[in-house]
Amino acid sequence: MNYTKEVALSLLKIEAVRLRPEEPFKWASGWNSPIYCDNRLTLSFPESRNLIRDGLVDLIRTHYPACECIAGVATAGIPQGAIIADSMNLPMIYVRPKPKDHGMQNLIEGKITKGQKIVVVEDLISTGGSSLKAVEALQEGGFEILGMIGIFTYGFQIAEDNFKNAGITLHTLSNYDELIKEAVANNYVKQDQLQTLGEWRKNPGDWKK
């Protein structure tokens, strides 16, 4: 199966991805964006959820066959990680953005053995900053990180640089280029909007400021 294409189409169909080149969204980072991606919506659609489950499992079996444990990145990576771990009959843990301020004050939740080989699961990759913080926490906890998988990446150069500098490989089911290709082919956006969509991807921080 061509997961790159099918996942892009599924995200468009269920409106997990919305494209508004003329009416940009405002991200939490302050960036203006012609695209908004909420992969949490895939959990509400069994067909999409199962497609993503099968695709992520395939990524692990293809690229990280030595995987011994799944680690979800809070919060959106947790349900995806749980679904994969259940499908593969593997243990699972998850990583908080910061330690709890009560109880055991855990940053990593779950119980596995130090030194185990882990694949980290994210739902969406933008700059990679928060994802790589989770990786760093796991490495400091004594675990071996095989790599990271995710549903979708915007394909920013800064993300590619961040993962390269961290020495972490990343594999996602779909990406911005494929999504825009399918969006045009299926009339979610018009051909004359492609230039705007391309300009944003090249310089997202300064687009339409």
Curated annotation (Swiss-Prot):
Signal peptide: none annotated. It catalyses: orotidine 5'-phosphate + diphosphate = orotate + 5-phospho-alpha-D-ribose 1-diphosphate. It is an enzyme of class 2 (transferase). CDD domains: PRTases_typeI (cd06223). Its EC number is 2.4.2.10. The keyword Magnesium applies. GO terms for molecular function: magnesium ion binding; orotate phosphoribosyltransferase activity. Keywords: Glycosyltransferase, Magnesium, Pyrimidine biosynthesis, Transferase. It holds the Pfam family Pribosyltran. The keyword Protease does not apply. Orotate binds at S126. 5-phospho-alpha-D-ribose 1-diphosphate binds at R96, K100, H102, E122, D123, L124, I125, S126, T127, G128, G129, S130. GO terms for biological process: 'de novo' UMP biosynthetic process; pyrimidine nucleobase biosynthetic process. Pathway: Pyrimidine metabolism; UMP biosynthesis via de novo pathway; UMP from orotate: step 1/2. Belongs to the purine/pyrimidine phosphoribosyltransferase family. PyrE subfamily. Homodimer. Catalyzes the transfer of a ribosyl phosphate group from 5-phosphoribose 1-diphosphate to orotate, leading to the formation of orotidine monophosphate (OMP). HAMAP family: PyrE. This is Orotate phosphoribosyltransferase. It comes from Cytophaga hutchinsonii (strain ATCC 33406 / DSM 1761 / CIP 103989 / NBRC 15051 / NCIMB 9469 / D465).
